[in-house]
Amino acid sequence: MVGFTVAPELIGICRPAVAWLEGARVVERDRRTDAQLTQVEQGLRERPPAEVASVRTMYKRIGLDPTKTRPSSEALLRRVRKGDALPRINSLVDVCNWCSVEFQLPYGLYDAAHVEGAVTLRLGAEGESYPGIRKDEVHVAGRMTLADARGPFGNPTSDSARTMVTAATERAMVVVFAPADTAPDRLSWVLDKTVDRMAGFTGCREINRWLDA
């Protein structure tokens, strides 16, 4: 099992929660998740959740303007509020987006088979970047980023093509990038709910977790 650490510069700024999953059966389109997301979209338009101000504060504390570099959770909520549908990617990613937009916390979801060695949540160094998912290079200098033995591969705004989840994914790592003022009990509940939903729609099971108490 890979290790997980938070670099000193982010302690007191981000309180991540991590779960490792195995045995996932990911499909490109699942009618069950499709129906669930449609229901979620309708509910969010009727009763939109308050944007989590502490998530924006988390970005500001590392020098990022959250109105220009939006947390993934806020980007999803804005999309739904405009009347657009949540993206349909595959059954595991769709559940991840559902949790992110409902709980208004940024998530990262990664194919664990393509994560090499221990993972560290740290600030990106000057010149560091990675090919994004369906986009050009994602530059992470000065940004919160996950890095393994090969370098950066994800952050609370945009993840990498190298570790993206596909229909071939069987093992996954899900990360909740919660602000440091998130109550540990609340964060544990969010992770439990996320794992339960992912298990229900893909058949995966949790094999390990990391929580910053």
Predicted segment positions?
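Charge-biased, low-complexity intrinsically disordered regions
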Residues: 1-213
